[in-house]
UniProtKB/Swiss-Prot annotation:
Full protein name: Probable replication restart protein PriA
Binding residue positions for Zn(2+) 2: 380, 383, 399, 402
Gene Ontology biological process: DNA recombination; DNA replication initiation; DNA replication, synthesis of primer; double-strand break repair
Keywords, ordered alphabetically: ATP-binding, DNA replication, DNA-binding, Metal-binding, Nucleotide-binding, Primosome, Zinc
Organism the protein comes from: Mycobacterium leprae (strain TN)
Taxonomic lineage of the native organism: Bacteria, Bacillati, Actinomycetota, Actinomycetes, Mycobacteriales
UniProt similarity note: Belongs to the helicase family. PriA subfamily.
Protein function: Initiates the restart of stalled replication forks, which reloads the replicative helicase on sites other than the origin of replication. Recognizes and binds to abandoned replication forks and remodels them to uncover a helicase loading site. Promotes assembly of the primosome at these replication forks.
Pfam families (UniProt xref): PriA_3primeBD (PF17764)
Subunit field text: Component of the replication restart primosome.
GO molecular function: 3'-5' DNA helicase activity; ATP binding; DNA binding; hydrolase activity; zinc ion binding
């Protein structure tokens, strides 16, 4: 596979008689190209060629085991066309690195007969939702039903996924489920192995070692797996006779691939469902604008519960104005940065013997500081990154970007040496709550030290978004702090992501009938807060989609972000031959916090140009950019550019 874009095409080679039996479509081979050996795949065998020059010989067949199936190859081609990528880049995502010993050992073992078909599926869990029972019936009949599922608060989503997979397997088909991270994968594994024979289930994730991952992947390839579950790259798994593709929590940015061509697992899964003509399911506690667009277009059905059921299952949500807690008469409220009504709710839950969840947006102690006099943000003198406090005992500040310490902080604007906290992190919050609730255990769960589960006993659990532990029986209360840090970001998905973070935490709280309450420290008039209070993410997604359509933002349009030096971006535009309706936005400086494109000159200013086209011209946009990149790739002096189609964060 050649890494240069202009050589992303098929090449013809001669196959010797000794290699003929092994050199079948899909096998790995080594070929000589311009004097060096490169890896490749056999795509097809033909008796003729359209090449007019002299053909070279295949150097060797690396393995006689075909690893690139026809279905995966079609999916790879579709992803390349959708995201303006190259086949080598997508194939690296789709086909894992070979492990010779594992391959020899695996191929020496005969393929075992498939385990018994799962028993009948109890439909009661799905019948709570409108069209839920119909979706299971469609799976039993091997119909290509497509649905966007709105999970109820407190719902055991993994059980519903397991039931859907078991139904597809009972119909003689296979199923594929994609989740954001290892925690979700572990939860799903426990659920599916209670309904489907463990011998026919394979879990794939990036955390596996090369040998284990390749061994499991070969099991899928050989048809020994009826159900494959995994993280984002598992969406390319070579599942035989695929009948159902499922994606959980597509709002999670872990489903977006950080490597070129940056595909999103939701989009790849839907492409695969379309190509395979199989059923598809997108589920979550909230709903993205992209998932809702599938419903509004009629491509997918809406699977939601009646409002009466939602109200009965959801906790009571109370919005509290955060402007006045500093003046509260309760000293504990001032200490914990909480209105006294929120503290009373926490105390009531603790007194009832239930844990209390406290969600804070940032980890660390004080991750952001500002001048105490003029409120100018404190920034590093070396890289302009934000300065933070590590803990109470450590003197001075530390840069969050470069890690340099600054022992003598002085405001660059007014010269003051007084600082104030802009954002308070999880550890500082835990410290403050420990003082406000003397004698109460305080558990901290953050990105680097996640606690998977807490006991059903009184405790304060401070967690960052995505690190909330599960609690048997649910939390008695949840407090959502510093909500402005999520809502106030200048980002296309700020409101959508804030609601997802809040609902993911609130879904862990008991129903209102059992005393569950969620206190969100935010203005009740904010539309996103209102959606949380009503527990109505579908209407929020509808409003979000309408707003984006009005101003021309994805998913109502397709946008390509082109990053590189000004000269490189201009060269690409000249060669790309963009669609006539393409709208150019920018260029502007590369957004703060976005990494530079690989291979760009150090110190050179990097700009970002946005190219916007109507939704029906997305494939044309990708094709034109891919063609332009190929033309530039031929030139020895060209500078690299990075192209991302519909990136999560535009700028």
């Amino acid at each position: 596979m050649l890494s240069v874009p202009h050589l992303d095409r098929e090449f013809d080679y001669l196959v010797s008689a000794e290699q003929s039996d092994d050199a079948q479509p899909g096998v790995r081979v080594r070929v000589r190209f311009h004097g060096r050996l490169v890896d490749g795949f056999v795509l097809e065998r033909r008796n003729d060629t359209e090449h007019f020059g002299k053909l070279g010989w295949l150097d060797r067949v690396v393995s006689a085991q075909p690893v690139l199936t026809a279905e995966v190859r079609r999916l790879v081609d579709a992803v390349v066309a959708r995201y303006a990528g190259t086949r080598p880049d997508v194939l690296r995502l789709a086909v894992p690195t070979r492990h010779a010993r594992v391959e020899r050992e695996t191929l020496a073992i005969p393929v075992s007969p498939l385990p018994l078909i799962p028993g009948p599926v109890d439909p009661s869990g799905w019948e709570v939702y409108g069209r839920g029972g119909q979706f299971l019936t469609a799976l039993a009949e091997s119909r290509a039903a497509r649905a966007v599922w709105q999970a109820l608060p407190g719902e055991q989503w993994a059980d519903r996924f397991a039931e859907a997979a078991a139904q597809a397997i009972r119909a003689g088909r296979a199923a594929l489920a994609i989740v954001p991270d290892q925690r979700d994968l572990d939860v799903l594994w426990r659920a599916v192995t209670t309904r489907v024979d463990e011998r026919s289930v394979v879990a794939l994730s990036a955390g596996l070692g090369q040998a284990v991952r390749y061994q499991r992947w070969l099991k899928v390839l050989r048809g020994s797996a009826r159900l494959v579950i995994g993280t984002r790259s598992a969406v390319f798994a070579p599942v035989n006779d695929l009948g159902l593709v499922m994606v959980w929590s597509d709002a999670d940015d872990m489903l977006a691939e950080p490597r070129a061509p940056y595909p999103h697992a939701r989009e790849v899964a839907m492409l695969r469902a379309y190509q395979a003509r199989c059923a598809a399911l997108i589920g979550g506690y909230t709903r993205t604008a992209e998932a809702h667009a599938l419903v509004r277009s009629g491509w997918a059905h809406d699977v939601v519960a009646a409002r009466s059921v939602v109200r009965a299952r959801a906790p009571r949500v109370v919005a509290l104005d955060d402007s006045g807690y500093a003046e509260e008469s309760d000293p504990a409220a001032r200490t914990a940065r909480l209105p006294s009504i929120a503290l009373r709710a926490a105390r009531s839950a603790l007194a009832a013997g239930a844990p209390v969840l406290v969600q804070v947006p940032r980890r660390g102690y004080v991750p952001s500081l500002a001048c105490g006099r003029c409120r100018t943000l404190a920034r590093c003198r070396h890289c302009t990154g934000p300065l933070s406090l590590l803990d109470r005992a450590t003197p001075g500040t530390v840069c969050c970007w470069c890690g340099r310490a600054d022992l003598t902080l002085r405001c660059a604007r007014c010269g003051s040496e007084v600082v104030r906290a802009v954002v308070v992190g999880a550890r500082r919050t835990a410290e403050e709550l420990g003082r406000a609730f003397a004698g109460m255990p305080v558990i901290t769960s953050v990105g680097d030290t996640i606690v998977p589960e807490v006991g059903a006993r009184p405790a304060l659990v401070v967690a960052t978004p995505g690190a909330e532990p599960r609690a048997p029986g649910g939390y008695g209360a949840a407090l959502l702090l510093d909500t402005w840090a999520l809502l106030g970001r200048q980002d296309l998905r700020a409101a959508e992501e804030a609601l997802w973070r809040w609902m993911t935490a609130a879904a862990l709280v008991r129903a209102r009938g059992d005393g569950g309450v969620v206190m969100v420290v935010a203005e009740a008039s904010i539309p996103t807060v209102q959606s949380l209070m009503r527990w109505d993410p579908a209407s929020h997604a509808e409003a979000e989609l309408a707003a984006r359509t009005e101003v021309g933002l994805p998913p109502s349009v397709h946008i390509a972000a082109v990053d590189g030096t000004t000269g490189a971006v201009n060269e690409l535009l000249q060669e790309a031959r963009l669609p006539d309706e393409a709208d150019l936005l920018g260029p502007v400086d590369l957004p703060q916090g976005v990494r530079r494109p690989a291979g760009t000159p150090l110190g050179a200013p990097i700009s970002r140009l946005l190219v916007r086209v109507p939704r029906e011209q997305g494939w044309q946009l990708a094709a034109s950019l891919r063609r332009g990149i190929g033309v530039l790739s031929v030139r020895q002096t060209h500078q690299l550019v990075r192209v991302q189609i519909d990136p999560l964060h535009i700028g």
